[in-house]
């Protein structure tokens, strides 16, 4: 054997024995930059066979899926008899990983032996490596989490981003996902070398990964985009922080606190831009990998404090009793709230009803870009504020949007249209006024907002919710969820009013999008004076005045039931009309 051949054999042996070395060679072949320190650290963790059940969490854009595909190839090179199952949220995503694995095998000449032989499986979704012995299960199989998981056994299961916004936004969706991942136990070979590896980024505060850690004995290793920014964040990470980062941080926490962990990949300027784009909560989830946000003090606006029920469009009960319990919990509506923040109807309500008193349409005009023109339709009655409709339009204040808003005003027979004048110095009102007049006669009022938006929202809405004076028409929640879409028309729960409401905090940039929420806040602020009424007291006073006025009328006999409106309250009574003498003379 020539000296060159000897050197080649030594290099190949080194690559086969060291995944980090293999990664450097592969990155070079792919014309990628040299692996960064965090990528190298991830490679070491993956190659450590002692990690049997663990969750690898790394910030968006670090390349964890690429590294894991490389790990699959390297693992099969070392032991071609292993069976690996790749599961992703969608079939397409799983297949992309499978295709990339095949491309790696085709790319590196020293991996020729891994190419499928004639007669072996050789498809995108399922293939064998050359030295693999005939077996019921393929060497590599890719499948979506909702696909056909059964029928194969695996030595290693890699769950790559099985949690995405569309399958984790509501409590019902999260429960379904949790049920699906329980199948992994039946698919994993009962061997001491078998492994389950989750790769992912938390999508919600109630992330699947937290449940796995708390209830299934998984360990979590985290590579956040920044070193811990506070003592509280450091305490949350604890032993979860990648050992390399933990050692670096402990040695120089004063200099490293809040600094980028991998400045070659993302420097501070890049990360600041992403924080503005995702909002503080989104950035903390997807770049800091910290789902520990479910704090009642931090997030004061909760769905459970509202009353959600079906509503008549003309009248409503005079008062409600709020008492959240299992009997009045609504599990059919899409719930985008935090964990434990359930949707409830009322416990009981008054038999007396009244016509709605004020009817307003509120508009938060937007400019161009990613903002929506948010709107809300609010009614009032006896100290309660009713949310009848809410939504947003993605195209600023185009003619189409103005027409749609004017039609909303007519549909709900509003008396007043309220808009925020900060945008364009009142220009929206001048543009909208003639369009509104064409469809509906209503007053047009502008409100100028002052101070930090997040503080305004929390300070305005918290008293309404904490006193249970907000009543939400049940279909508003369903429609809001279905219409939450980004500028490209893709479903994005961050545009939902109730997602924005439950993630709002008293800090700058708490949520990335707040257009629907700000419109709702504007309407509540406009109607705030109506909340000064004591619903039960007002109802009693109206009834007492009614009775006092008619106590002196003679009663002749039992008659038929009559209804009438008194001070906005609808009353029912039995009247005698035998001789033309009415018990109550209206």
Swiss-Prot record:
Residues the entry annotates as binding Mg(2+) 2: 364, 420
Gene: 19
Entry cofactors: Mg(2+)
Record GO cellular component, one term: viral terminase, large subunit
Region annotated Involved in prohead binding, chain positions: 571-586
GO molecular function: ATP binding; ATP hydrolysis activity; endonuclease activity; metal ion binding
Residues involved in Mg(2+) 1 binding: 364, 518
EC code: 3.6.4.-, 3.1.21.-
UniProt-annotated stretches for the region Nuclease activity: 344-429
Result, substituting residue 424 to E: Defective in DNA cleavage
Sequence motif: Walker A motif, positions: 58-65
UniProt name for this protein: Terminase, large subunit
InterPro entries linked to this entry: Gp19-like_virus, Gp19_RNaseH-like, P-loop_NTPase, Terminase_large_su_gp19
UniProt domain comment: The ATPase region is in the N-terminus, whereas the nuclease region is in the central part. The C-terminus is involved in prohead binding.
Residue ranges of the region described as ATPase activity: 1-229
Pfam families the record matches: Terminase-T7_RNaseH-like
Placement of sequence motif Walker B motif: 156-161
Alphabetical keyword list: ATP-binding, Endonuclease, Hydrolase, Magnesium, Metal-binding, Nuclease, Nucleotide-binding, Viral genome packaging, Viral release from host cell
